[in-house]
Curated annotation (Swiss-Prot):
PANTHER family: P PROTEIN. InterPro entries: Arsenical_pump_ArsB (IPR000802), Cit_transptr-like_dom (IPR004680), Diverse_Ion_Transporter (IPR051475). This is Uncharacterized transporter slr0753. It is a multi-pass membrane protein. CDD domains: P_permease. Keywords: Cell membrane, Membrane, Transmembrane, Transmembrane helix, Transport. It comes from Synechocystis sp. (strain ATCC 27184 / PCC 6803 / Kazusa). GO terms for cellular component: plasma membrane. The chain crosses the membrane at residues 1-21, 26-46, 51-71, 97-117, 137-157, 178-198, 223-243, 244-264, 285-305, 310-330, 340-360, 377-397, 425-445. Belongs to the CitM (TC 2.A.11) transporter family. It is found in: Cell membrane.
Length: 449
């Protein structure tokens, strides 16, 4: 087990960063950045090693950056404000239809864009619209977050956790779509079923004075049409890119889409390159890079290998039992630990466990491993992915999209307390983890059949 000072120090820094993030005393990016730099300054990990660990996750960072630029480039067209207003008008004064509208609009967007990015775009539109029709916008924001986190399971690129795990086990966009996206459907259905009970006040409401709503107009329609072509091509290549004679991974597709969107926005003069790049969420990117360094230190000092040995002792070679245990264990952990660092830590841990129990050779531990893991152990990674994604619905600090929504709510004068979010999040998380465990069990049953 862990017995050396650097390992204990790395573990202490990791736990300290997580506690700082949970306390919300300082910004999560500062907490992670500080933790990474402490490890570099104390020479637990060198700066070069830290950069190497960041570069191992280049695909995740490139995908995030590309999507952020792509989406920000088309903000001046006001397409998202227009969609939000149409959502309220289509509800025709019905709280029930409004809640279903939030689910219907958020779901497809989050299937193809990272959930935190989608929340950044749609959440700022909810408070003014809700205030116009006289309802509390906090429950609507919380519902949007639940949907965003859950819909991330619909595709490989919909959630950072799914992309990180998918990248680690080398699953293609199409394979994910056919094998695992049904779990995203089940997660959304579970929200639809539970919404009338959790949000009963708004569900039963009737709104009046809809004629007083703001009516935003779409700007630059020709640019928006061209942008629609770019986004359509990006989505098509997300699906077919990796199956082409010369494979094109999702990260490369996102970067090309971002470049074309920048070119279109700049040449049409709807915005400047400087403004678009300035508004990229650099804070989130730096947070991820810092977390990759911290997780790298856990790998280097042997903490990850020690935890893998412990997992092998507890679970043994019973993959089915281990998968079900992982759904709930990772789900509960993800409710208090942001799911990105959790997944980044769990991937090498699970790979080491697979090696320890003899299901694969040590070559799978290499950063450049591009083969396939044995089919028997894949349910472990699926279970970890589902637990990390759906567990993020449990508390305010469980996912980055939760924190984004809370910040937007506070800007509009209604802070979301930890306990208020918990009141909604706990039942949603409990239902979804049970559904995920049943789905993983079904996957293993059909695999054996």
């Amino acid at each position: 087990m862990v017995a050396n000072l650097p390992a204990l120090f790395s573990l202490g820094v990791f736990v300290g960063v997580i506690l700082l993030i949970m306390s919300e005393k300082i910004h999560l990016t500062i907490a992670a950045f500080l933790g990474a730099l402490i490890l570099v300054f104390t020479h637990v990990i060198t700066l070069k090693e830290g950069i190497d660990y960041i570069s191992q996750s280049y695909a995740t960072l490139a995908l995030f950056f590309g999507v952020m630029v792509l989406v920000r480039s088309f903000e001046p067209t006001k397409i998202f404000e227009y969609l939000a207003t149409q959502m309220v008008l289509l509800a025709k004064g019905s709280g029930k239809l409004l809640m279903l509208g939030v689910i219907a609009i958020t779901t497809p967007i989050c299937a193809v864009l990272p959930n935190a990015t989608t929340v950044m775009l749609l959440a700022p539109l909810i408070p003014p619209l809700a205030q116009e029709i006289g309802v509390d916008f906090v429950p609507i924001l919380i519902l949007m977050v639940f949907v965003a986190n859950s819909a991330g399971l619909l595709t490989l690129v919909g959630d950072p956790a799914t992309f990180i795990v998918g990248d680690a086990i080398n699953i293609s966009f199409n394979d994910y779509l056919f094998k695992l996206s049904f779990m995203g459907v089940l997660a959304i259905v579970s929200i639809v079923v539970i919404t009338p009970f959790l949000f009963r006040h708004i569900w039963r409401s009737r709104f009046t004075h809809l004629e007083d709503l703001p009516h935003p107009q779409i700007n630059h329609p020709k640019v928006l049409m061209a942008g629609g072509v770019i986004i359509t091509l990006v989505l098509i290549f997300f699906v077919i890119g990796e199956s082409l004679p010369v494979p094109i991974p999702p990260a490369s597709v996102a970067l090309m889409g971002a470049c074309l969107a920048l070119l279109l926005a700049s040449q049409s003069k709807i915005d400047t390159v400087h403004n678009i790049l300035r508004d990229v969420d650099w804070s989130t990117l730096i947070f991820f890079m810092s977390i990759f360094v911290i997780i790298g230190s856990l790998e280097k000092t042997g903490v990850t290998a020690s935890l893998a040995q412990l997992l092998a002792v507890v679970v043994g070679q019973n993959i089915a039992f281990g998968a079900i245990v992982l759904v709930f264990t990772v789900g509960l952990l993800s409710s208090v630990v942001p799911n990105i660092p959790l997944v980044v830590a769990m991937v090498p841990l699970l790979k080491q466990y697979v090696v320890n129990i003899g299901f694969a050779g040590p070559e799978i531990l290499g950063a450049n491993f591009d083969g396939q893991l044995p089919a028997e152990v894949l349910p472990l990674f699926y279970a970890m992915m589902f637990g990390a994604t759906l567990g993020g619905n449990g508390t305010l600090v469980g996912a980055s999209s939760n924190i984004v929504a809370a910040g937007i709510s506070e800007q509009h004068g209604r802070p979301i307390s930890f306990h208020r979010f918990l009141r909604y999040g706990l039942p949603v998380m409990a239902v979804q983890l049970v559904v995920a465990a049943l789905f993983v069990a079904w996957l293993m049953f059909t695999q054996q059949g």
